[in-house]
């Protein structure tokens, strides 16, 4: 009798694992192939060889790139090279990427930047918020951008128990931000288990010096985050659910879900065109190829443009798709004055004139 019970439990366990495995492949879009959608006036950005996971652009055309991300299970073309922040002036006739110097005293050897966000204060001070993963932990670094010196002055490191696995960030004040946790756990094995079992424990946290609180939860894997030009709505990408969540910002900074836009791809970082409110999205057509890297079958790249997301029928346009022959693993797409920048998790970055 005991053996029968044991065999029954083993069978149930194996069936559950098999079902979860198939579900994970579906969430990763592991069987998806793509056909190219090309743009005519594009070139790879010189000096970016280890990815530009996130990009943020100031109103004056200065673009910041988060480069060199390394993560457990993620491919890297330069595993021993620290990450950094690069800058490009999009108003230049021939813009080029330059690495920003970081103030003395900041640990550059362990700098592992992920999501970034800028904030301009009332006195025109520019703050750069950077999600950092030193030793694969999660911190938020706040820098002051010193334009005359092309440098970053480190102001503060933020750690908090509600920020265990930060992916992206949107600054809403000089020391205030919303952040996505792509996992509930910080331990790599528990993160993998959480993803495999599809627990939907990822969340969004609001941080200020006075208050830190959970403001949205129930995501499969909360990823990119951004805010509408009028600051009324926060957008969150759920990468493994292939969704963008629209949340209304309340006076107390809580978030109330308004709608969910379903997409047929893995949505990563979200960028907002300040003039139109359009959302530009860096996407992964096949997520499995990001983690099981093979040079003959590299991860593809995809850029979507979403117009009128608050309407009953938002317009979703595929702007660019490449099978990985040029650009591998697009994670962000952002626009400035008809100039499109597309960054990747760990490969290169693309500059296009539309």
Curated annotation (Swiss-Prot):
Mainly localized where?
Answer: membrane
- Location within or outside the cell: Membrane
Cystine residue pairs: 42-352
Q: Which GO terms describe its cellular component?
A: extracellular region; plasma membrane
Residues bearing carbohydrate: 254, 269, 323
Q: What InterPro entries does this protein's entry cite?
A: 6-blade_b-propeller_TolB-like (IPR011042), Arylesterase (IPR002640), Paraoxonase2 (IPR008364), Serum_paraoxonase/arylesterase (IPR051288)
| PTM text | Glycosylated. The signal sequence is not cleaved.
Q: Where do the catalytic residues lie?
A: 114 (proton acceptor)
Q: Which residues bind Ca(2+) 2?
A: 54, 116, 168
Query: Topology in the membrane?
Result: Peripheral membrane protein
Keywords noted in UniProt: Calcium, Disulfide bond, Glycoprotein, Hydrolase, Membrane, Metal-binding, Signal
Q: Which cofactor does it need?
A: Ca(2+)
Name the chemical reaction catalysed here: a phenyl acetate + H2O = a phenol + acetate + H(+); an N-acyl-L-homoserine lactone + H2O = an N-acyl-L-homoserine + H(+)
Cofactor binding mode and count: Binds 2 calcium ions per subunit.
Q: What family is it from? A: Belongs to the paraoxonase family.
* Self-association state and partner proteins as the record states: Homotrimer.
Q: What does this protein do?
A: Capable of hydrolyzing lactones and a number of aromatic carboxylic acid esters.
Protein name, UniProt field = Serum paraoxonase/arylesterase 2
Query: Which gene codes for it?
Result: Pon2
């Amino acid at each position: 009798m005991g053996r029968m019970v044991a065999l029954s439990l083993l069978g149930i366990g194996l069936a559950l694992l098999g079902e979860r495995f198939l579900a994970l492949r579906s969430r990763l879009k592991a069987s998806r192939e793509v056909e190219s959608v090309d743009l005519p006036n594009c070139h790879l950005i010189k000096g970016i060889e280890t990815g530009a996971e996130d990009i943020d652009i100031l109103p004056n055309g200065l673009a910041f790139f988060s480069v060199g991300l390394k993560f457990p299970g993620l491919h890297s073309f330069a595993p021993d090279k620290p990450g950094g922040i690069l800058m490009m002036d999009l108003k230049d006739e021939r813009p080029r990427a330059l690495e920003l110097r970081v103030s003395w005293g900041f640990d550059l050897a362990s700098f592992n930047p992920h999501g970034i966000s800028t904030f301009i204060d009332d006195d025109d001070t520019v703050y750069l918020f950077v999600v950092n993963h030193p030793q694969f932990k999660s911190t938020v670094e706040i820098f002051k951008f010193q334009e005359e010196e092309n440098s970053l002055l480190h102001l503060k490191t933020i750690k908090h128990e509600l920020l265990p696995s930060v992916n992206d960030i949107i600054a809403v004040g000089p020391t205030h931000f919303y952040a996505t946790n792509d996992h509930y756990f910080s331990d790599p094995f528990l993160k993998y288990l959480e993803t495999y079992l599809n627990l939907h424990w990822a969340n969004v946290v609001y941080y200020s010096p006075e208050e830190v609180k959970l403001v949205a939860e129930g995501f499969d894997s909360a990823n990119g985050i951004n805010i509408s030009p009028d600051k009324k709505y926060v957008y969150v990408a759920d990468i493994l659910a292939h969704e963008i969540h629209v949340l209304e910002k309340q006076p107390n900074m809580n978030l109330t879900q308004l709608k969910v836009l379903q997409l047929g791809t893995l949505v990563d970082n979200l960028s907002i065109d300040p003039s139109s409110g359009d959302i530009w999205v860096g996407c992964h057509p096949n997520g499995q190829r990001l983690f099981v890297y093979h040079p003959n079958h590299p991860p593809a790249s995809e850029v979507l443009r979403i117009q009128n997301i608050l309407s009953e029928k938002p317009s979703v346009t595929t702007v660019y798709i490449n099978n990985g022959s040029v650009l591998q693993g697009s994670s962000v797409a952002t626009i400035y004055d008809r100039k499109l920048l597309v960054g990747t998790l760990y490969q290169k970055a693309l500059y296009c004139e539309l």
